Amino acid sequence: MNEFEDIIYPGPSHVTTNIEFEDENIENNENYLNLVQILKELVDNNLKEEIEFKPMVGGVTNTLFKSSFITGQGSNKSVIIRLYGKGSEQFIDRKTEANIQYLLSKNGVGPKFYGTFENGCIYGYVEGDQLQLEDLYQNNILSLIAKETGRWHSLKLDINSNSQLLLSSSSDSSIKESTTISTSTSTSTSTSSTSPSTSPSLENSTLSPRNMNTQTSSTSLFKNLNSWINNAMTLTSKESKGSMISKINLNRYKEEAMSLMSFIEEHYSGEEYINFCHNDLIPRNMIYNKEKGQVKFIDFEYSGYNFRGYDIGNFFCEFSGLDLDYTKYPSIEIQKRFIKNYLISINNCKNIQQKQKQKQQQQQIQNSINDENMDIENDELLYEPSKEEIHNLYIESNHLTLGSHLMWGFWGIIQHFSSSIDFDYIDYAIKRFKQYDLVKNKVLSLK
């Protein structure tokens, strides 16, 4: 059993209506009736029109509302309405995002996805509490986040078609071959990986990003860096010399990004390093259900195949919050505790998949992976990651934090020109670039 609603539709629907809100007081907005009609078409045609809209705070890409109403059957229901941020199409392929949301919901990994309208989408409300920064330091919650991250990284998803979600242990070889990127849930360290005794540097990376293999070039990190750098350079090309942006040497950070991608290609190009990732594991994208003892992820707009070290390293960066207080960056002890529980989760999912594969029962594989009663504590009795395994992934994740700093730095530059959300994107970008400079040598010298 899983907490999300059963999917009862063949695929996501689309309504050709555009919603424009100048403020968060939807009830007084002239588009209110349009939004009611969208809810009727996508969610419940017989819903009662006494609808409550509650703004969800904290978003820096989109505007979110929780909509509560009474269904035609007389029951209470809540959904999330997301209005796409102005200019966010520069970062996000909305068609791919809708397909990912549909496939994740169909497999029980995400909430029910009802469909899209011209500048937004609607999906189910996940019961629980949105995590706050301070929650990340609680051992039980950190373990649950690690468990859910491991479960995500065990999935195989064809994000370029409307095919069903595929588990990495599928016994059908033809199904395996249909996926866009082949991944592995192996927790062993590749012989080509960076050894803890090695101190790599970007200067030693000689591969050209243009010649990178298809698997690494298709990762979210590489695609985003290549695209966002070009967008940022174009947008800033006409800035006056006295502006704040003109003081950022984007050409240098572009070169840093090229060198970093070559470095990652050299050390982390094996398929064991690439999984289906959330890519935006910030506290407000995690819902904690205390009663069920679960943490579930929401908001999948940046999700896609990526380096596992990026997903983990980016999560560590998010301990610093939107104000980027890096004194809150997790200690080595906290990082390794998270990594240990992550490896346990990955191994547990892999073992379940292998056992069910032997029985040739694909449905049982899916149900087992989605079993909400699978707990970290019991898994520890079955598998104990080695210190070397934990340490190697610790180094890998910290190497990939460099990609996080650069990627979100360029994101901030673009958002400055396009977003209507009240947030200091330039200050955010400057701080991410500065942190890259500050930690680069230290991170690359990890042994």
Curated annotation (Swiss-Prot):
Q: Tell me the Gene Ontology biological-process terms attached to this UniProt entry.
A: phosphatidylethanolamine biosynthetic process
Q: In which pathway does it act?
A: Phospholipid metabolism; phosphatidylethanolamine biosynthesis; phosphatidylethanolamine from ethanolamine: step 1/3
Q: Any idea which UniProt keywords this protein has?
A: ATP-binding, Cytoplasm, Kinase, Lipid biosynthesis, Lipid metabolism, Nucleotide-binding, Phospholipid biosynthesis, Phospholipid metabolism, Transferase
List the residue ranges of the region (Disordered). 178-217
Cellular component, GO, one term: cytoplasm
Q: Does the keyword Cytoplasm apply?
A: yes
Write out the GO MF terms. Answer: ATP binding; ethanolamine kinase activity
Q: Where in the cell is it found?
A: Cytoplasm
- Spell out the Low complexity composition-biased ranges: 178-208
InterPro entries xref list: Kinase-like_dom_sf
Stated EC number for the protein is 2.7.1.82
* CDD domains in the cross-refs: ETNK_euk (cd05157)
Chief subcellular location equals cytoplasm
Which reaction(s) does the protein catalyse, per the Swiss-Prot or TrEMBL entry? ethanolamine + ATP = phosphoethanolamine + ADP + H(+)
Q: What does this protein do?
A: Highly specific for ethanolamine phosphorylation. May be a rate-controlling step in phosphatidylethanolamine biosynthesis.
Q: Which family does it belong to?
A: Belongs to the choline/ethanolamine kinase family.
The name under which this protein is listed is Probable ethanolamine kinase B
What gene makes this protein? Answer: etnkB
